[in-house]
């Protein structure tokens, strides 16, 4: 359901994003009984997220949503634990029918923008049904070519017009400000991703606000972490947070000390980039032997020419750096 499945061992940055989500759940568990939550997500054929959620968070009530029958058959064959209910159902139909009467952790991992307006409608629908302290994580593609592929030789003005029309077609007036002003400079390779992050974040906020607007309990959605990362052809934006009233949020924020969490996003604009370098075992061992001493680490990193962004990113995320080994089974 989440698109073409690519294993985590080929997507180091996505693996780190997942580790940040797990840390966030651990942070919330200081006041919330996370183990009693129902986990809802897109398992894929290997159900790797579900295996991790059970092993690391001790969740024992989990629901996997899948539309493709062939993948659903593989899920049932690869089922790691019998506490996972693999359903052959679309996310829309599930959200429509499910009561959300029990505390929930929902991860909607979207890999394609082709149905993004429908996906946002599902988020709006979900927001009408959740309760305080329910947790929602969403992943959106932000690879510009996924929204419009610039043609060879296409002028910048023509590209801008076609790109804007594609955004209007995909998001519609419901989720896109049709008066949005886009400059030619916004379409440079360096800036266009930031533009898309802003557009998709605003669309997500709009879906949430529409869903919550008619409620009597006046809960809001509070982001904990916003991340962007690239793994090969995939450029993704992830938003993780929870629903609560303002007093509930303030109490939980103080109890869990959000502001001192290394990966806490202080605002909707605080999108943190995960871009770890690919290291040899020798390089990693050498760097790790100097950590967490930043001065010694910087000197070691300069020995094999890591650029400043790579050095800073590894220093920030080294605890979460995945370590994959080949084994004989």
Segments predicted by a language model, with ranges:
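A structural signal for short, well-ordered beta-strand segments and their strand-loop junctions
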Residues: 41, 64, 107, 135-140
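Beta-hairpin (beta-strand-turn-beta-strand) motif
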Residues: 89-92, 109-111, 141
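Class I S-adenosyl-L-methionine
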Residues: 2-8, 96, 100-103, 113-329
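A generic, well-ordered mixed alpha/beta core segment in the N-terminal half of proteins
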Residues: 83-86, 104, 111
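N-terminal start-of-chain detector that recognizes signal peptides
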Residues: 34-36, 109, 211-214
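Structural motif
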Residues: 38, 104-105
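SAM cofactor-binding core of SAM-dependent methyltransferases
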Residues: 2-99, 255-257, 271-284, 288-293, ...
């Amino acid at each position: 359901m989440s698109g073409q499945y690519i294993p985590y061992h080929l997507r180091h940055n996505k693996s780190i994003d997942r580790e940040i989500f797990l840390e966030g759940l651990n942070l919330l568990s200081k006041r919330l009984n996370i183990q009693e939550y129902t986990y809802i997500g897109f398992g894929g054929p290997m159900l790797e997220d579900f295996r991790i959620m059970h092993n690391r968070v001790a969740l024992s009530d989990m629901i996997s949503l899948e539309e493709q029958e062939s993948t659903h058959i593989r899920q049932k064959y690869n089922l790691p634990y019998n506490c996972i209910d693999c359903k052959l159902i679309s996310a829309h139909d599930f959200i429509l029918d499910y009561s959300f009467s029990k505390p929930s952790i929902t991860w909607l991992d979207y890999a394609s923008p082709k149905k993004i307006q429908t996906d946002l409608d599902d988020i709006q629908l979900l927001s009408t049904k959740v309760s305080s302290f329910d947790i929602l994580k969403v992943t959106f593609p932000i690879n510009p070519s996924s929204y419009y592929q610039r043609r060879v030789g296409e002028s910048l003005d023509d590209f801008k017009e076609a790109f804007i029309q594609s955004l209007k077609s995909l998001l519609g007036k419901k989720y896109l400000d049709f008066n949005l002003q886009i400059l030619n400079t916004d379409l440079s390779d360096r800036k266009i991703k930031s533009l898309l992050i802003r557009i998709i974040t605003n669309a997500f906020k709009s879906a949430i606000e529409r869903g919550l607007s008619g409620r009597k309990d006046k809960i809001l959605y509070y982001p904990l972490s916003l991340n962007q990362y690239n793994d090969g052809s995939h450029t993704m934006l992830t938003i993780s947070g929870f629903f609560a009233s303002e007093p509930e949020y303030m109490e939980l924020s103080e109890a869990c000390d959000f502001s001192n969490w290394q990966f806490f996003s202080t605002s909707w604009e605080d999108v943190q980039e995960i871009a770890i370098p690919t290291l040899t075992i020798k390089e990693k061992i050498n760097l790790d032997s100097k950590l967490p001493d930043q001065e010694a680490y910087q000197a070691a990193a300069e020995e094999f020419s890591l650029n400043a962004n790579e050095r800073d990113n590894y220093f920030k995320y080294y605890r979460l750096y995945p370590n994959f080994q080949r084994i004989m089974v």
